[in-house]
């Protein structure tokens, strides 16, 4: 899977968080298409497993927040999940299979694939990591053309990805509850190419943290930044990837910076 690595010239990069989710239903094909139409070089999405083992694209462990349906994703078949409307009455959207998104984005952009396998959730799998296996199998089978980054809050999940697909870049997501330098040390230990603190964790750590990560050979991404000022100063710090629900704004901020790449 070496062909899925990021080109060094791509950075800094704007990541469309769940697609163009400020203007479209999150994690839907409409949202991803809108992000690509804007010129977003990378779209971020969340992957979970249905009851019948299909990787589906949904942030939450249940359907209630983002659809007109209900129920735990891991207890519903793919067809049952597809019956829910993730859009509006006028413009219905279905929860996509991961394979559908791979096919839609292939050759047009990159993917940041967040593995949702969170301790405390009903579907948590602390041994088999079936979701990682299934997601990687879909990337391979789809013949996806473009960079792919596997990210997770769960160190086990990205460790499994690194074990199963060692050439595929991985990134460790973390919140303010985790010490940034401890997260960086873990990433170095585990061979991850990225750390992804939330911006509320990154801002207090300051530009010195970004410098330390870069000196260690680790790239720094952050999420979720929806205001121009924060987006701008994070780029000033040398942050490599900034995820936003408003990729149009992020792309504008990046374009206004002389000498910056746009991915």
What are these regions (language model features)?
Residues 1-263:
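Phosphate-group recognition and catalysis centered on beta-loop-alpha active-site segments
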């Amino acid at each position: 899977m070496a062909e899925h690595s990021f080109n060094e010239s791509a950075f800094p990069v704007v990541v469309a968080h769940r697609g163009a989710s400020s203007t479209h239903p999150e994690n839907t094909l409409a949202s991803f298409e809108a992000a690509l139409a804007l010129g977003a070089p990378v779209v971020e999405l969340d992957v979970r497993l249905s009851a019948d083992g299909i990787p589906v694209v949904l942030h939450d462990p249940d359907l209630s927040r983002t659809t007109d349906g209900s129920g735990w994703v891991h207890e519903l078949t793919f067809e049952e999940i597809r019956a829910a409307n993730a859009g509006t009455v006028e413009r219905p959207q279905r929860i996509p299979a991961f394979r559908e998104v791979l096919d839609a984005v292939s050759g047009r952009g990159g993917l940041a694939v967040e593995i949702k396998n969170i301790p405390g959730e009903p579907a948590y799998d602390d041994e088999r990591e079936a979701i990682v296996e299934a997601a990687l199998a879909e990337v391979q089978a789809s013949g996806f053309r473009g960079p792919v980054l596997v990210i997770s809050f769960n160190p086990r999940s990205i460790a499994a990805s690194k074990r199963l697909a060692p050439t595929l870049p991985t990134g460790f997501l973390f919140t303010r509850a985790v010490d940034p330098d401890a997260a960086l040390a873990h990433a170095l230990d585990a061979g991850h190419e990225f750390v992804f603190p939330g911006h509320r964790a990154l801002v207090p750590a300051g530009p010195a943290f970004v410098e330390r990560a870069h000196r260690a050979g680790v790239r720094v991404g952050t999420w979720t930044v929806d205001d121009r000022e924060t987006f701008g100063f994070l780029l000033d710090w040398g942050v490599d990837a900034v995820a936003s629900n408003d990729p149009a704004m992020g792309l504008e901020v990046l374009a206004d910076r002389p000498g910056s790449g746009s991915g």
